[in-house]
Amino acid sequence: MIRHIAIFLCSLLMCSTTFADSVTSVSLGALLTALNERMLLMKDVAAYKMKHHLPIEDFTREQNVFAEAEEEAKNNGLDPHSITPFIRSLMDASKAIQYRYLAQWRTGSEPSFPIQTLSVTRQRIRQLDNQMLIIISQRLMVGAFSHDDMVWLRAQFNAPNLNESDISNVLAALSLVRRAR
């Protein structure tokens, strides 16, 4: 009888380790996809703002994004205060990308692709932000992001006009995110 219990417990332990590994690999890939897609959308945002002569900086909008992210963080079991640096880093990287596109277009040809409305693009950005918070929360249930996770994310995080400093800031802020107690 004891032997059967020992075998059962060993099997359970192996299954939980396998499950945790699969959650980790799936969540890292999904997180990376959402991060890259979010940054790719900045080209659309920059094009719209250029066409309509809008500033890149929008303090009121940023405050709304923080409030929405903190609420979504709470809903997903994350410490809302720990998510603030991550959201800030995403916004800073996003604005940097927009400025870089504007500089390119002002010295060369303007965008020649169909420009999405800002409301449609912002809706998709919000969906991606919420998706990232869900993924991060699920990932943190099985443990913190490891050094290897961060190395992998850094190697794969590669949207146009995103530089190494932007990537470092986003990943450093990601490592600060915690689950709520």
UniProtKB/Swiss-Prot annotation:
Superkingdom of the organism of origin: Bacteria
Major site of localization recorded for this protein: periplasm
Gene label: aroQ
GO biological-process terms attached to the record: chorismate metabolic process; salicylic acid biosynthetic process
Record's protein name: Monofunctional chorismate mutase
NCBIfam families: CM_mono2, PRK08055.1
Entry-linked PANTHER family: CHORISMATE MUTASE, SECRETED CHORISMATE MUTASE
Known pathway: Metabolic intermediate biosynthesis; prephenate biosynthesis; prephenate from chorismate: step 1/1
GO molecular function, one term: chorismate mutase activity
Residues binding substrate, per UniProt: 38, 49, 58, 62, 98
Lineage: Bacteria, Pseudomonadati, Pseudomonadota, Gammaproteobacteria, Enterobacterales
EC number(s) from the headed UniProt entry: 5.4.99.5
